[in-house]
Amino acid sequence: MNQYPLVYLDHVHKNYGDAPALYDVSLNIQPGRIIGLLGPNGSGKTTIIKLINGLLQPTSGHIYLKGVKPSPDTKRIVSYLPDTTYLSDSSKVIEAVKYFQDFYDNFDSTKAMQLLKDLHIDPQVRIGSLSKGNKEKMQLILVMSRHAELYILDEPIGGVDPAARDYILQTIIQNRTPQSSVIISTHLIADIEPILDEVILINQGQILLHENANQLRQQYNQSIDNLFRNQFRFY
């Protein structure tokens, strides 16, 4: 058994030039958890996500995935859904599936095709012809069809209708293994709150708290959504 945390940030600082983005961030994320990474715009959420993915390097401090620093060898551990569309509208859905199949050795194309079928998405249509909701669902399907140990989802339900949000949350729950963890960054806290095991609150590049979601609700006698609104009502 691997004795290391799934994700470990050790006193991480990140500057963009002279501007600090993260200040002395330490995090310990264990397997089998769904974690909400919550904070106002510009708080440092996306910087943390990119550091874990190895897309940025810390100014100081250390980041480990199962005891190893982010590298090409750790790419199979993490499946990442960015907050912007990364697939060409001119490509067909089936081409996106084949791209993931060729690029990731832990991608389950059978699962992806079945999920697309469940949505009645024709794999031969071009991505640009899909509705916004179906496009976001398709991207999530691709990410969740990898047998990864950590799924990082940046605003996975932003800009879609409530019915689409429900589908996306169910897809997240049903397509992870009990030992895989999910980090969700979103502003739509009320929608994701029911599935969260843990909450990380961040502001101005600093971690304010990292706690069990149920314990937070009991401690403050309010929902995570209300706690967030009260904490950041002036931001």
Spans of features found by a protein language model:
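The feature captures the beta-strand-to-loop junction immediately N-terminal to the Walker
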Residues: 38-40
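Helix-to-loop junction immediately C-terminal to a conserved catalytic motif
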Residues: 53
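ABC-family P-loop ATPase nucleotide-binding domains
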Residues: 83-139
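Conserved ABC transporter NBD signature motif
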Residues: 60-74
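Catalytic Walker B motif of ABC-type/P-loop ATPase nucleotide-binding domains
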Residues: 151-155
